[in-house]
């Protein structure tokens, strides 16, 4: 008797490979997406908030929007679209019942977000505090400020740093986690997080400073206080959690006194697109936001970090480096990248003919 998808508990490597071999572009059409060519290797899904599919290696990547950074193969795609567990997604992809469903083109519907599930709190916050102050270089007073407001705490199970965004009634609506370990890249949002509710500091001026991540927000504030002697609390500050402006718009709705915006997002000067071309996603987005919000009557400016982000700037400044030193570091990184490209570039066909 054939097992249903729900009956699968474990899968062989061949079964997982079979599930991941299902064509993602066909899956996307089945979910109601409309493909359009976006480059030599990428296919963009219209009205998707930045969903790109790469048929050559059967992968997808979400560049912007609330799901910014989500990527993977066919299994991950089905898990994302239908909010399924890994076993159910694999069973759906390799089961006969899936083949019948995949041929049906149904309108795409964004799945309703479930309730926010906050990680359990640890008994203390020593590890999170140590990581943010000693490893990330953030001012102790600033870390304590957010911890005292229950916007930062330490997760009980793994010791991760937890950052919480609240709505106007004080209800947690957004939660992101970051490993409190040096050299770890782990970070993720908690189940049910709504990125339109930012991690924030409510100031008193008419200026809002927009960063990408909570650590960026606190790093920018630390630079303001420790290196320029200004009151970091005077201005409003939010982190968007991605390169999507949902959090900006929601914060502006609740703070009509704000008339000036500073976009202090990442300086992705070494980032590349899927075709290998340099693409400074952070600054491209900042330029787009300047155009949009200037058109809406706001005074806008961009504060570009010298290195990749303001936390990198802060950590280097803590070592005694000047802003001129940071600029030299950036130029050295770019020069090394350009030299690497030049070394890998194939010889010109005309030059090859001359040598023969």
Where are the model-predicted features located?
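Phosphate-handling DNA/RNA-contact segment within nucleic-acid enzymes
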Residues: 55-56, 153-254
């Amino acid at each position: 008797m054939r097992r249903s998808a729900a009956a699968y508990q474990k899968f062989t490597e061949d079964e997982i490979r079979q599930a991941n071999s299902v064509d993602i572009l066909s899956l996307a059409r089945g979910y109601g997406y409309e493909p359009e060519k976006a480059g030599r290797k990428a296919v963009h899904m219209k009205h998707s908030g930045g969903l790109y599919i790469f048929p050559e290696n059967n992968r997808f990547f979400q560049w912007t929007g609330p799901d910014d950074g989500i990527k993977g193969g066919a299994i991950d795609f089905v898990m994302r679209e239908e909010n399924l567990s890994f076993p159910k997604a694999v069973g759906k992809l390799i089961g006969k019942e899936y083949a019948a469903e995949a041929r049906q083109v149904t309108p795409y519907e964004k799945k309703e977000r479930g309730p926010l599930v906050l990680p359990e709190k640890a008994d203390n916050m020593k590890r999170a505090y140590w990581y943010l102050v000693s490893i990330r270089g953030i001012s102790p007073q600033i870390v304590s400020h957010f911890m005292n407001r229950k916007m930062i705490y330490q997760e009980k199970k793994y010791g991760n740093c937890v950052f919480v965004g609240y709505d106007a009634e004080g209800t947690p609506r957004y939660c992101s986690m970051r490993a409190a370990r040096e050299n770890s890249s782990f970070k993720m949002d908690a189940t049910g997080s709504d990125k339109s509710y930012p991690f924030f500091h409510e100031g008193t001026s008419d200026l809002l400073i927009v960063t990408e991540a909570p650590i960026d927000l606190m790093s920018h504030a630390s630079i303001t206080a420790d290196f320029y002697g200004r009151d970091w609390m005077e201005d409003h500050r939010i982190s968007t959690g991605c390169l999507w402006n949902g959090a900006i718009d929601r914060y502006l709705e609740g703070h009509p006194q704000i008339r000036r915006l500073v976009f202090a997002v990442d300086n992705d000067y070494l980032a590349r697109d899927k075709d290998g071309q340099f693409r400074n996603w952070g600054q491209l987005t900042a330029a787009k936001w300047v155009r949009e919000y200037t058109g809406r009557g706001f005074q806008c400016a961009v504060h570009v970090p010298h290195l990749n982000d303001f936390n990198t700037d802060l950590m280097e400044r803590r070592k005694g480096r000047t802003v001129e030193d940071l600029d030299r570091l950036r130029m050295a990184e770019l020069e090394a990248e350009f030299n690497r490209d030049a070394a890998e570039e194939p010889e010109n066909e005309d030059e090859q003919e001359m040598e023969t």
